[in-house]
């Protein structure tokens, strides 16, 4: 009953108004899975390739008809008749058929959409929720947890049209007893932040991930206004709510000069100086997690950063590791960072994503499941976070349906699982247990 009878691809629109790939996988017995590929703005150079058409007369070159042709043509032909329950085999067929190191023939956007749609179809055929099916694929059947959210409530960098260099300033509602309570706390801080920003004469328009995107005097001011909002919401900073940042430092790294150029603040730093700048912020504010604190190629700098901060806080590799087990293995061996950001479309299949999560956990690294800045209503990452018991999730702020869809799915899952899926809060963050 889980044999694939049809694979279908279509071009849909993501949260930034750009096309993306949506796929359907149909099985015997009428079971159907549907999934869409997300898309990033600040991307690591070693990510799997997102195939775009390049036809400037259509969607300004961002069309995905070539990827759709791959889904409806060679991918569909290769998968019809295969057993959808064997996810590893399904993904292996597509990867082998593509035949490139970075999935550039069909596009990671094509392969991923089919991979996730297949998992959803298989879950339907088994009569179980997607998170339960993912747990079985992961070899951890019946082991679930609700993730601690990192809520991106001030957007900067590539995610906003403002003068803030650091890309994301996030809150973690660590004082919550449940995921649902964490979402409520996040929403309350978010609304209070709007009031704080308005009182200072700042803009309250939102960026790509639903966080506010004001022009600020400094990166430290972003943390200061969040601290005010946390207090205004009736919570204690450092106890009820902790802070996290995604520097996305590759975006302001001048490769030729070898310096970090923070134009918003009018400052430049060497690797070592920037590490000490971050350490200063960690001393000043209850920051428990920093992502991509240096350029993806600055491994010597990351080694220094890990020595400086790795025992105190979580250091997450996003552009650094790009959900790739080969790169992660090298990072583990060299003691670089202590956590990995997990993005499906950086690697391009569910099987490879699960392998990256397992490798991280086996090495004592944490895994943070993440959205992309270009999203859809697809909430698969919520099921991935619960089904792998990853412990943490990054899926934007408390506005924009493309972000809130994931929180709402987590609320539903928590309701269904009850005590079978504990919410462990701050214990999930590396260095904070």
Swiss-Prot record:
Q: Identify one Gene Ontology CC term for this UniProt entry.
A: phosphopyruvate hydratase complex
Q: Pathway membership of this protein? A: Carbohydrate degradation; glycolysis; pyruvate from D-glyceraldehyde 3-phosphate: step 4/5
Write the record's keywords in alphabetical order, separated by commas. Answer: Cell adhesion, Cell outer membrane, Cytoplasm, Glycolysis, Lyase, Magnesium, Membrane, Metal-binding, Secreted
Q: Where does (2R)-2-phosphoglycerate bind?
A: 167, 343, 372-373, 394
- EC code: 4.2.1.11
What start-end ranges are recorded for coiled-coil regions in this protein? none
Cited SMART domains:
Enolase_C (SM01192), Enolase_N (SM01193)
Look up keyword Glycoprotein and say if it applies: no
What remark does the entry make about the cofactor?
A: Binds a second Mg(2+) ion via substrate during catalysis.
**What cofactor is this protein dependent on?**
Mg(2+)
Gene3D superfamilies assigned to the protein according to its UniProt record, in alphabetical order: Enolase-like C-terminal domain (3.20.20.120), Enolase-like, N-terminal domain (3.30.390.10)
Protein origin, superkingdom: Bacteria
Instruction: Tell me which family the UniProt entry assigns to this protein.
Output: Belongs to the enolase family.
The name on file for this protein is Enolase
């Amino acid at each position: 009953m889980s044999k694939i009878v049809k694979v279908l691809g279509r071009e849909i629109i993501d949260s930034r108004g750009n096309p993306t790939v949506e796929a359907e996988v149909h099985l015997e017995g009428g079971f159907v899975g549907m999934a869409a590929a997300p898309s990033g703005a600040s991307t690591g150079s070693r990510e799997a390739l997102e195939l775009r058409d390049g036809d400037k007369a259509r969607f300004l070159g961002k069309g995905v008809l070539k990827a759709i042709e791959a889904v409806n043509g060679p991918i569909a032909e290769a998968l019809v008749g295969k057993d959808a329950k064997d996810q590893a085999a399904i993904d292996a067929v597509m990867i082998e058929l593509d035949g490139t190191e970075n999935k550039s023939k069909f596009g990671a956007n094509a392969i991923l959409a089919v991979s996730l749609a297949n998992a959803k179809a298989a879950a339907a055929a088994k009569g179980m929720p997607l998170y339960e099916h993912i747990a079985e694929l992961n070899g951890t059947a019946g082991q679930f947890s609700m993730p601690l959210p990192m809520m991106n409530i001030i957007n900067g960098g590539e995610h906003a049209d403002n003068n803030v260099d650091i890309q994301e300033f996030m809150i973690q509602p660590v004082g919550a007893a449940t995921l649902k309570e964490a979402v409520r706390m996040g929403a309350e801080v978010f609304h209070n932040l709007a009031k704080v920003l308005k009182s200072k004469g700042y803009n309250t328009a939102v960026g790509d991930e639903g966080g506010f995107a004001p022009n600020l005097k400094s990166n430290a001011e972003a943390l200061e206004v969040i601290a005010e909002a946390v207090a205004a919401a009736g919570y204690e900073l450092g106890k009820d709510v902790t802070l996290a940042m995604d520097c996305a430092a590759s975006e302001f790294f001048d490769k030729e000069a070898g310096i970090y150029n923070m134009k918003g603040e009018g400052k430049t730093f060497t690797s070592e100086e920037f590490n000490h700048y971050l350490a200063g912020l960690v001393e000043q504010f209850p920051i428990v997690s920093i992502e991509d604190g240096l350029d993806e190629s600055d491994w010597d700098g990351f080694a220094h950063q890990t020595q400086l901060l790795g025992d105190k806080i979580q250091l997450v590799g996003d552009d650094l590791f790009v959900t790739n087990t080969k790169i992660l293995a090298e990072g583990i061996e060299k003691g670089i960072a202590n956590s990995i950001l997990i993005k499906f479309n950086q690697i391009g299949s569910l099987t490879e994503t699960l392998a990256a999560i397992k490798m991280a956990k086996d090495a004592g690294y944490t895994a943070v499941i993440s959205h992309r800045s270009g999203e859809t209503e697809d909430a698969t990452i919520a099921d991935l976070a619960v089904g792998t018991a990853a412990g943490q999730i990054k899926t934007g702020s408390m506005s924009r349906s493309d972000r809130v869809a994931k929180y709402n799915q987590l609320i539903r899952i928590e309701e269904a699982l009850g005590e079978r899926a504990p919410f462990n809060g701050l214990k999930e963050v590396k260095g904070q247990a």
